[in-house]
């Protein structure tokens, strides 16, 4: 622009790009009602009228001027760049739902039987002329955008067509990066404590009171939360100390008054007042209905967060894990009082390393200190949790999921265990609720029920709740998944001690070790895993029942965790790809287990969500990484395309849905899961605002394997087998198809 030239005042279209975040796109600057001066969307368009009054023009010809119709066909040429003027958001939403949402679930999907078209006004004509929005995808995006606009209090909006027909791959990536992660982020502080402390999972009088338990050695946190409760008595917040030694008996005693467990906080100084206050580190939760920090979910979500450059949140979750190990003795299933005895699959070393690298690596002294604190905590967890009774099996030298605990898990539905309890209630001639109270109080002793709950708690600790692979036996299984993770701990600790800490580290107990010590532990575990878990004939790593001294034969996708951890030999990896993979590779990626291993499903033996035909993001991501590490990048790419296809297909056809798990055998409605708890992320009205944590990560990570050609195929929802069939030979090689 020439100097001295006045700058043209921007129109709405010039202020924001069509893919900006909702707070910008639907912010005050784009509200047509708040424009201080007329712009091209608020001025009335006039029509040129040529009358036949001039003798010059009428000489020999009569000009019949046709009025341009209100259906703005002239704009079709600019399709994709148009802007729509919605002058009444509420009314348009009502019309859209009445016309298109024929099943009344506040979503527009391929199952609705509406006309799949809606007339909306154009922005250039101030809504005078109209165009058609057609098809399930655009109409469902319109529903989503109008729902968001309404949530922002907007009565009128200018909508870019580009936002409605956005490439689905780009749209889902954008939503995950700029909206879903933000919606899933939590932080425990004065403003949020009441909402986060509230617990909907436990239905007892004591659970209705928001309550937080603070570790014995955290007086600053205790005073902080006491101050929170005093500053706002309406919160009705209870603040309580935990004892220095936490026993299963004490944990059970808290079940009538369950509460949130405090997490890591840091001191911040107010730049205005100069006063210091505590602020909780941020973390993300698995889904919108959760408020707790979960164990292995956090690692898998951190992978996506780091790729989206949200390092502060990933770092915050590592800080919370360090805090949990220091004060609660372990990384918890989640930070609620009834989880104090239960851990989850351990991923801390890899998580800390990945954050460290994004945090500046060894060039950043703060990052080095962070890494050291994380690994000292990991060593404590390794020794005191996984290599100690009751989880460590001395005979095999391997570890099991085997948490402590007494009585019924309080976070379950009241009638969840009625079937198993009925015969015991009848035996004692009492009702099921009465028996439950008697059992929890220790008034009756039932060894069979004790063992049932032992394995039930172990299944929950494994993260795979539930599966017939683990049911009624989990606490006795040295699983391939857990022992792969512990091998990774040993290798990671050896690497970090050697590379960053001068080959020496002193742990919480004052014991100093070197990298060779940890390498030796890893070598021993690798030998034992091969001895007890590897089956050369089938190409699977199985689990080993330490109670009866026998290897199982349940085909599970967790076999690939051995490749993720790097413990498999190249020959074992080759065998897994040749023999195990064909049994687990389905239309939409890896299935949790084979149909043969799962067995027959009946009324008395219903589906389990971690079994066939369901696929889970953790299994996909760990397998992709493992296969890639062993030179099977093409196989990883093929599996990633299959998984991304399912996600994209459901996202396009079902109103932007992103769910916890998918049926990897179905190409039409893969999000539909009937097993056990249903499917988290499916129950929303108008717009999905969070997705599901580790599934969000899987989409971000899976796309790293895709080139432009594959992304276009995904955007068109091209079925994997059709996509693979029509590839050129060089492309087929990239997917290990030839």
From Swiss-Prot:
Belongs to the glycosyl hydrolase 37 family. It comes from the Eukaryota. The lineage of its organism: Eukaryota, Fungi, Dikarya, Ascomycota, Saccharomycotina. One of its GO terms (biological process) is trehalose catabolic process. It holds the Pfam family Trehalase_Ca-bi. It comes from Eremothecium gossypii (strain ATCC 10895 / CBS 109.51 / FGSC 9923 / NRRL Y-1056). This is Probable trehalase. The keyword Signal does not apply. One of its GO terms (molecular function) is alpha,alpha-trehalase activity. Residues 1-44 are annotated as: Disordered.
């Amino acid at each position: 622009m020439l100097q001295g030239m006045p700058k043209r005042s921007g129109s709405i279209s010039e202020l924001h790009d069509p893919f900006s975040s909702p707070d910008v796109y639907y912010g005050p600057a784009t509200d047509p009602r708040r424009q201080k001066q007329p712009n091209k969307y608020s001025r009335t368009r006039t029509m040129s009228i040529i009358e036949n009054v001039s003798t010059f023009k009428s000489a020999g010809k009569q000009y019949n001027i046709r009025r341009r119709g209100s259906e703005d066909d002239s704009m079709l040429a600019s399709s994709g760049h148009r802007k729509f003027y919605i002058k009444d958001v509420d009314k348009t939403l009502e019309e859209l739902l009445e016309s298109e949402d024929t099943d009344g679930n506040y979503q527009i999907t391929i199952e609705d039987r509406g006309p799949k078209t809606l007339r909306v006004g154009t922005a250039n004509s101030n809504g005078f002329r109209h165009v058609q929005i057609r098809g399930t995808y655009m109409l469902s995006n319109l529903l989503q955008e109008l729902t968001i606009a309404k949530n922002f209090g907007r009565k009128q909006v200018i909508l870019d067509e580009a936002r409605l027909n956005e490439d689905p791959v780009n749209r889902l990536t954008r939503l995950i990066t700029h909206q879903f992660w933000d919606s899933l982020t939590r932080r425990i502080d004065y403003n949020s404590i009441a909402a986060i402390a509230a617990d909907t999972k436990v239905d007892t009088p004591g659970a209705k009171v928001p309550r937080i338990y603070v570790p014995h050695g955290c007086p600053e946190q205790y005073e902080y939360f006491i101050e929170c409760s005093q500053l706002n008595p309406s919160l009705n917040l209870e603040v309580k100390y935990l004892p220095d030694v936490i026993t299963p008996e004490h944990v059970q005693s808290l079940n009538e008054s369950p509460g949130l467990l405090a997490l890591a906080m840091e001191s911040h100084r107010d730049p205005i007042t100069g006063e210091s206050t505590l602020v909780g580190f941020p973390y993300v939760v698995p889904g919108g209905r959760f408020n707790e920090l979960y164990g292995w979910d956090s690692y898998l979500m951190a992978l996506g967060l780091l790729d989206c450059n949200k390092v502060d949140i990933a770092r915050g979750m590592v800080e919370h894990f360090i805090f949990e190990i220091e004060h609660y003795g372990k990384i918890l299933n989640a930070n609620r009082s009834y989880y104090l005895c239960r851990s989850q699959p351990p991923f801390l070393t890899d998580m800390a390393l990945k954050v460290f690298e994004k945090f500046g690596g060894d060039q950043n002294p703060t990052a080095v200190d962070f890494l050291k604190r994380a690994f000292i905590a990991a060593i404590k967890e390794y020794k005191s949790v996984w290599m100690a009774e009751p989880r460590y099996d001395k005979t095999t030298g391997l570890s099991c999921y085997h948490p402590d605990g007494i009585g019924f898990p309080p976070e379950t539905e009241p009638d969840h265990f009625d079937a198993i309890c009925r015969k015991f209630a009848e035996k004692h001639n009492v009702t099921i609720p009465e028996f439950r109270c008697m059992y929890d109080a220790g008034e009756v002793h039932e060894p069979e029920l004790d063992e049932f709950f032992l394995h039930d708690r172990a299944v929950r600790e494994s993260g795979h709740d539930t599966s017939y692979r683990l049911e009624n036996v989990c606490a006795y299984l040295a699983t391939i998944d857990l022992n792969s993770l512990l091998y990774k701990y040993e290798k990671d600790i050896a690497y970090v001690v050697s590379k960053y800490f001068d080959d020496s580290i002193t742990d919480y107990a004052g014991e100093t070790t070197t990298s060779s010590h940890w390498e030796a532990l890893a070598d021993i575990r690798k030998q034992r895993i091969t001895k007890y878990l590897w089956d050369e004939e089938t190409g699977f790593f199985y689990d080993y029942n330490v109670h009866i001294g026998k290897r199982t034969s349940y085909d599970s996708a967790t076999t690939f965790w051995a490749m993720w951890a790097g413990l498999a030999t190249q020959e074992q990896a080759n065998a897994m790809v040749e023999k195990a993979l064909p049994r687990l590779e389905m239309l939409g990626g890896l299935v949790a287990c084979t149909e043969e291993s799962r067995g027959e499903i009946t009324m008395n033996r219903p589906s389990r969500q971690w079994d066939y035909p369901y696929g889970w993001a953790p299994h996909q991501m760990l397998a992709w990484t493992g296969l890639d590490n062993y030179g099977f990048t093409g196989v990883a790419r093929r599996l990633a395309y299959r998984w991304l296809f399912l996600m994209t297909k459901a996202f396009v056809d079902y109103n932007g849905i992103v769910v916890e798990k998918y049926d990897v055998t179905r190409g039409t409605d893969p999000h539909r899961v009937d097993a056990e708890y249903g499917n988290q992320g499916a129950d929303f009205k108008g717009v999905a605002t969070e997705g599901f944590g580790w599934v969000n990560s899987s989409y971000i990570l899976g796309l790293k394997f895709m080139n432009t050609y594959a992304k276009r195929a995904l955007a068109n929802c091209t079925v994997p087998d059709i996509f693979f069939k029509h590839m050129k030979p060089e492309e087929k090689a990239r997917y290990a198809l030839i």
